[in-house]
Amino acid sequence: MDIYTYKKHILFKKCFLYFWKIKNVIKKKNTKKFNQIVLSLFLGGFSSFSILYCVQSILPVFSKQFCLTATESSLSLSAATATMSIGTLFIGPLSDRIGRKSIMSSSLLIAAVLTIICSISNNWTVIVFLRALTGLALSGVVAVAMTYIVEEVHPNSVSFCMGLYISGNTIGGCSGRILSSILAEYFSWHIAFIVIGFFSLMSSCLFLYFLPSSKNFYPISIDFNKFLKNFYLHLKNPTLLILFAIGFMLMGSFITIFNYISYRLMLSPFFLSSSNIGFLSIIYLTGVYSSPKAGILINQYNRSSILRIALLLMILGLLMTQYNEIFIIILGLVIFSSGFFASHSIASSWIGFHAKIAKVQATSLYLFFYYLGSSIFGTFGGFFWFYLKWIGISSFIIIILIFAILLSLKLKK
């Protein structure tokens, strides 16, 4: 059994056990409303992130078909994450006015339709533009889903529901990458977009039908002066600024590595197919373990020390990818990803401790910088690939992570 067949077998086994466990937990909750909420939000998170990240594993396919550099091809993802980062700042307050469910449902529907339209285009500029609109639409789910959970779910069940939603995000992003890489290899990227688009369209209809309307939502008017003032206060907070910068560097590093590792593995001495490269997305599931593990460790040890250890793990994993052995590269990516998810978990959870007012807006700012880092570094890394190949990418990311470690030294427990 080769390593890819083995990884596929492990994936299907873990998914079966995961969903069996979820089924039993949901059964214990035993309320129709709760079941509808968790399953709808899982589906919403799954669809959103499968749309967002379906392009990442097929960037070399775009490069070949449209005669693009790696930098230009990465715009299909960077354009979406850039507009999504901007949308997260403003969609939240808009949902305070017109409602949570309507924002999320319309966002999913629009994103699905845009993905289907994207599948029939053969103009790269149009595709990037449509992807930018798709990212803006998806910000309606990213920025609102967690607020809906806090408002509508009993406090004792919030953690489980939040975890299931985040699992939907992770598994959706992983599945989108795998499915698009397989369909692009055996059919075309057009077919990949059509399949993912229509699946998401059906998901948005099920989401709209099954998700209960908000019972604890009360519309409020938007006070733009207060809105901008809160942003200003957060940006004046030195600790929050450091956390925003670390989030910016974390996501930028993570996306850059997975944007360009596919180009490396398609070359000598690996010559991997796009579908095999797509299955590397299974590595993302390391976050299911490392994120909660980091949460346990920061309650026992110094939070900033655990953050620095996680960042050092990312550097260690990245150094391992310099070898020309596929097993060592995969192991390096696993270590790198584990460090990333642990670091992100620590940094994002720290926001609430230092935001004294308007914590939702503080979280929105973190997400803004988080996805902005994905857009900027994810595209800028292409220049390092063009001139220096993988050693250039690795050096670029290691420098970024060293800066993140230096910034973390200024953080107190």
UniProtKB/Swiss-Prot annotation:
Membrane topology reported for the UniProt record: Multi-pass membrane protein
Localisation per UniProt entry: Cell membrane
Transmembrane region(s): 42-62, 75-95, 109-129, 133-153, 157-179, 191-211, 238-258, 265-285, 304-324, 326-346, 362-382, 383-403
InterPro entries: MFS (IPR011701), MFS_dom (IPR020846), MFS_trans_sf (IPR036259), Sugar_transporter_CS (IPR005829)
Gene Ontology annotations for the cellular component aspect, listed alphabetically: plasma membrane
SUPFAM superfamilies: MFS general substrate transporter
Protein name as catalogued: Uncharacterized transporter BUsg_567
